[in-house]
């Protein structure tokens, strides 16, 4: 390592440096950071070194801004997992973000979302404390997978990965690892 630079991110006089997830937009040299502590998503420009906290449009629900995991989809939509469910957010240049919040009431098996992956069909898979949920953003339908379908039902933070060669989705939990082949 030849060079290391750290950044302290502040908002309203408070320091927010606890991040649990990241995503990168190569075309724009933007790094998106999932923040804990109520401020949600941070957009960091790697060229200018400037950052901004992106409003989550739900000040009444502090947990929405407590991002545990993130997925940046092929259609440039953010899916953010939190202790209160999933937030689907589309950013628009110069306009407020389009935000939808989903929880158990909407069909997610459990509100504690530990991991989010997109499959090759554009569906989003959520690992939760009570099983897996597949979300189809085209029709907003949730399908839940739980015992006896799964050997692992309680998943862990940051224990998810998509194989770039096969498209298989892997999720780790407190009693093992499962993989999903969305094509079969």
Positions of predicted regions on the chain:
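Carboxylate-rich, polar loop motifs that coordinate divalent cations or form catalytic acidic clusters
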Residues: 1-184
């Amino acid at each position: 390592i030849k060079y290391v630079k750290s950044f302290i991110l502040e908002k309203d006089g408070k320091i927010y440096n606890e991040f649990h997830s990241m995503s990168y937009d190569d075309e724009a040299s933007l790094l998106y950071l999932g923040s804990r502590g109520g401020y949600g998503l941070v957009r960091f420009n790697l060229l200018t070194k400037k950052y901004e906290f992106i409003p989550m449009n739900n000040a009444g629900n502090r947990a929405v801004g407590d991002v545990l995991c993130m997925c940046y989809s092929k259609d440039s939509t953010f899916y953010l997992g939190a202790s209160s469910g999933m937030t689907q957010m589309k950013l628009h240049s110069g306009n407020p973000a389009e935000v939808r919040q989903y929880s158990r009431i909407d069909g997610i098996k459990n509100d504690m979302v530990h991991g989010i992956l997109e499959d090759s069909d554009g569906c989003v898979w959520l690992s939760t404390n009570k099983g897996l949920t597949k979300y189809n953003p085209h029709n907003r339908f949730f399908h839940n997978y739980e015992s006896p379908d799964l050997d692992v039902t309680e998943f862990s933070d940051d224990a998810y990965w998509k194989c770039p060669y096969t498209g298989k989705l892997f999720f780790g939990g407190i009693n093992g690892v499962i993989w999903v082949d969305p094509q079969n």
